[in-house]
Amino acid sequence: MELGRSSSTPQEEAISPLGVLGTGPSSSPLGKLQALPIGPGAHRGAHSSSAPAGDSSTREPSGAMKIPNRDSGIDSPSSSVASENFPCEESSEGSPSPAILGLPSETASDSRVPQDNPQEEEDSGVGEEPDPKVTLFRPQEDVSLTQCSDPQKLLHIAQELLHTEEAYVKRLHLLDQVFCTKLTEAGIPLEVTTGIFSNISSIYRFHGQFLLPELQKRITEEWDTNPRLGDILQKLAPFLKMYGEYVKNFDRAMGLVSTWTQRSPQFKDVIHTIQKQEVCGNLTLQHHMLEPVQRVPRYELLLKDYLKRLPRDAPDRKDAERSLELISTAADHSNAAIRKMEKMHKLLEVYEQLGGEEDIVNPANELIKEGSIQKLSAKNGTTQDRHLFLFNNVMLYCVPKLRLMGQKLSVREKMDISDLQVQDIVKPNAACTFIITGRKRSLELQTRTEEEKKEWIQVIQATVEKHKQKSETFRAFGGACSQDEEPTLSPDQPVMSTSSVEPAGVADSNGGTPGIESRKSSSKTRRDKEKPGCKSCGETFNSITKRRYRCKLCGEVICRKCSEFKAENSKQSRVCRECFLEEPLVPPSPSSETPTELKQNAEKPPSVDPRPSLLCGTLNLSDDGTTWNEVWAAIPESDPQVLDLLAGSQAGRLLYSIPLSGCNITMPDPEEGLEAGCAWKLHQGSQTWWLSAPSTKLQQCWLKALGTAVHGDTAGDRPGASQPQAPAGTDTP
């Protein structure tokens, strides 16, 4: 059975192809998209019904031809046409296969789902007439390459972008509103569905409510007067960084799907029931989950082709180049997440082989090389099987375990890279040998071939040299930090001279003057008694990479990352996050209250969110402005354009994950008579949330952070960024 056809399954419950994001097709930004058909034969049916009967260019291809899907790079029924042929591409003339911007066509036979009824069903050819405003360009038109101008080429690329975006939004809808919703309704635990689908809901809302409507309006309505794509992509490209979280979780999600399919009959029944529906296109859940992983590179390829055909003096040139930079950054962000997960997977595999003998699963560790090797006995020259694991900071010398299950290797020697030396030797009775010398032991090893020996020697030498360079850099950095380290005493406390502690000129038993030595000793004793970790993040201090600082308002010891807030524009005014949010942004005078009194008079700070966040804390949430519930709000660093609202505390379940792009922030009207003070409204489409902070200062901090995130600029405040306006005749709290 070809992927372009699907069998009928009337006994299965039909699933709506698109969810209802608003009250109707006209009230939702996806109104036009909701009118589009879904399914492998839907587009062909509509196309054939509207085409003339004698037009051979619109006929379906033979059953042996595969349907290319430019969105995912593999053959699937998501393509709206049976065969695409771009006349403006250099390879279109005389080519038996469609030219799709150089993307290879792959098969998806492994992802097919067997149907109960193997009989193929012919397309009926009956369907709704397509909307002329959203009718895509049909590349089957017989236009030669010489007749296709540059503006037409750009229009073809823009229409291809719109076409693939519409198909992609349907896939996202299928994942979020069909698979995830049905599994939740079937009673699958929330942590399982969250682990499988990650932040797919935020990705779906971004594309369905913002990117797709912008592209539809520009390409179908405004292209004749404003033929541009760069301004839209430049505005929305920063939000593509949210794909990093999905990509990083992808392997774990695949494992959860496989595990729950095998162990839970209910989970398996729900998945198989959906996969048999026409809306699923005869493809598995795993196939659809791969779409977001491949989407950002597709944008990059399309935009590169767009820039290649865009004239140098075009008005859209600058915006398009900037958009390509932002999309490439988002792609690099996803690739970095993939590489990080692959590195951790390698460490986990080694950890399992060693039976947990060595704690090597650490983001700072990196596996450089591993392999089996022979060890030469110093007594009789016999060889013994051994295994080497070379990391960036240590080498593990292991022996095989003689057991069928469980641990495969045991660590015989752990050799630090800083003390490691490698030497090539030539022995008449043993070829391909070299010696590794450590602090406690020397090993004479033998490889199978001379090339393998040279490779081990080169890799070990390069690893040792790189480790030495890093150590020298850390030592230099540590010396610079020691010179620039700030005093640990608060500026409010007077610095006592040594003469006030002991009379000047009083000698110790050895005849020396103990003034300076006494102060050094007391400073060291005080530091030893302090907590070893930061008050805010809890990370342990060290003398090189994690220096300690003291908050100038509350006096608590904090790290450099948690003391980036300043009460005034000077280095001597570092304060912690809690004091920065609650205290006036002016340094305390010597005659004011002591730091202890300031800490007692200040309101209770919010507990620290264990996840890295741009801003987090406790807020009150209401859906109607009358009933309020306490929630934990956070703007995560990994997804800075999303506001997460959790029930109760940071350990509670996720209530809302609100994409901040396109949101509006307003102040409530006094006539509403809200019970909670320091409140504001957050609008997204037709939905409104009422939020309230404990104090006016915290309210201003939240408004500033939300206003920055709404404009997609989390690196800093943009000049001229709009702030929420209060209703006329009222004062902003």
Swiss-Prot record:
Chain positions covered by the region annotation Disordered: 1-134, 481-535, 586-612, 712-733
A GO BP entry: filopodium assembly
Origin species: Mus musculus (Mouse)
Residue stretches of biased makeup (Polar residues): 1-11, 47-60, 106-117
Keyword Phosphoprotein found: yes
Residue positions, PTM Phosphothreonine: T732
Molecular-function GO terms, alphabetical: guanyl-nucleotide exchange factor activity; zinc ion binding
Keywords of this entry: Cytoplasm, Cytoskeleton, Guanine-nucleotide releasing factor, Metal-binding, Phosphoprotein, Repeat, Zinc, Zinc-finger
Compartment(s): Cytoplasm; Cytoplasm, Cytoskeleton
Cited Pfam families: FYVE, RhoGEF, SOS1_NGEF_PH
Residues the record lists as Phosphoserine modifications: S124
Compositionally biased region (Acidic residues): 118-129
Protein name: FYVE, RhoGEF and PH domain-containing protein 3
